[in-house]
Amino acid sequence: MCPLRSLLLISTLVLLHHLPHLSLGRSLPTTTASPGRSCLDYSQNLLRAVSNTLQKARQTLEFYSCTSEEIDHEDITKDKTSTVEACLPLELATNESCLASRETSFITNGHCLASGKTSFMTTLCLRSIYEDLKMYHVEFQAMNAKLLMDPKRQIFLDQNMLAAIAELMQALNFDSETVPQKPSLKELDFYKTKVKLCILLHAFRIRAVTIDRMMSYLSSS
């Protein structure tokens, strides 16, 4: 029989992957920083930061159709990463009958796992999360550069969110092997940029929830 925790995790990941209309909900409790912060700490910090940024955008851009019901949902990681599939619990990813299978250990440079050793599937999961973060970080930085040129100076990206992305990427500590990403925004249209900001923030919050769930699962394994 499949472990209940694994089944709950995969159900959550699939739900987040297919249901983009998630509400912001209540703010998460503040995580106390410590010298040896784990990736779970960083993922919780990221989720708080993107939730706060999205909430601010919805308030500031209330006339830009910035709610989850109004936007056209888009996933910039589609066909580029496979985080939901890569982050399946090992017993579900490698054996349909959910029987325990042998794990091959790999040494990782990051400090997401205390031992420094992790299975091949977990390494794939963490690398996919890293690539997701990298893509969103590049996109948000390019978008913020354009927003800074807006004469109205209506909204800018919260530097706390950009810092939270960078911190988790640094904690994961993977060398990216993907082709350098080019931001999708090409024209200097501030209205379209703000609409795109809403779309990306909604998508990124969903991904941040998925990442936080996965880090929670790994930290308790």
Swiss-Prot record:
Localization of this protein: Secreted
Known glycosylation sites: 95
GO cellular component labels: extracellular space; interleukin-12 complex
Keyword Disulfide bond attributed: yes
Secretion signal, residue range per the UniProt entry: 1-25
Gene Ontology molecular functions: cytokine activity; growth factor activity; interleukin-12 receptor binding
Principal subcellular localisation of the protein: secreted
Record text on subunit structure and interactions: Heterodimer with IL12B; disulfide-linked. This heterodimer is known as interleukin IL-12. Heterodimer with EBI3/IL27B; not disulfide-linked. This heterodimer is known as interleukin IL-35. Interacts with NBR1; this interaction promotes IL-12 secretion.
Protein name: Interleukin-12 subunit alpha
Species the sequence originates in: Bos taurus (Bovine)
Gene: IL12A
